[in-house]
């Protein structure tokens, strides 16, 4: 197939927006080393992905499920990043409280910060 048109692909994926998403997903897979289902020649991954769709070489349901799995993994990663950031803030606040306690002890004793630390405060 020398040229791929949207009309060739829309016969297999009726929604043009979904077509773009699925073709992009497949192009990413190809970029990561997935084996192409059509001859590559010198075509870019996006063209190869569209040719695979137009020639019915891919299972669209499998490609859709892969997309859902990636989205779920991204959500989990985001939650983990949020939790880590939240813990870091909590630790910073706890460290700030300890510094304030140390400052209070230093004031009570009339010592400087370095002197208070040397004494174990």
UniProtKB/Swiss-Prot annotation:
Keyword Nucleotidyltransferase: yes
Record bears the keyword Ribosomal protein: no
Keyword vocabulary terms for this entry: DNA-directed RNA polymerase, Nucleotidyltransferase, Transcription, Transferase
Catalytic activity reported: RNA(n) + a ribonucleoside 5'-triphosphate = RNA(n+1) + diphosphate
Source organism, top-level taxon: Bacteria
Coiled-coil region(s): none
Annotated stretches, region: Disordered: 95-121
Stretches with biased composition (Acidic residues): 103-121
Annotated GO biological process: DNA-templated transcription
GO MF annotation, one: DNA-directed RNA polymerase activity
InterPro entries the record matches: DNA-dir_RNA_pol_omega, Pol_omega/Rpo6/RPB6, RPB6/omega-like_sf
EC number(s) recorded for this UniProt protein: 2.7.7.6
GO cellular component: DNA-directed RNA polymerase complex
EC top class named in words: transferase
Family: Belongs to the RNA polymerase subunit omega family.
Subunit annotation: The RNAP catalytic core consists of 2 alpha, 1 beta, 1 beta' and 1 omega subunit. When a sigma factor is associated with the core the holoenzyme is formed, which can initiate transcription.
Function noted in UniProt: Promotes RNA polymerase assembly. Latches the N- and C-terminal regions of the beta' subunit thereby facilitating its interaction with the beta and alpha subunits.
Protein name per the record: DNA-directed RNA polymerase subunit omega
Organism field: Magnetococcus marinus (strain ATCC BAA-1437 / JCM 17883 / MC-1)
């Amino acid at each position: 197939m020398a040229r791929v048109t949207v009309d060739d692909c829309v016969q297999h994926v009726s929604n043009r927006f979904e077509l773009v998403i699925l073709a992009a997903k497949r192009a990413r897979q190809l970029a990561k080393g997935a084996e192409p289902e059509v001859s590559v020649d010198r075509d870019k991954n996006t063209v190869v992905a569209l040719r695979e769709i137009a020639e019915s070489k891919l299972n669209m349901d499998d490609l859709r499920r892969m997309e859902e799995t990636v989205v779920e993994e991204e959500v989990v990663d985001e939650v983990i990043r949020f939790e880590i950031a939240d813990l870091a803030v909590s630790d910073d606040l706890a460290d700030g409280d300890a510094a304030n306690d140390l400052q209070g002890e230093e004031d009570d004793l009339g010592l400087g910060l370095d002197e208070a630390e040397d004494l174990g405060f």
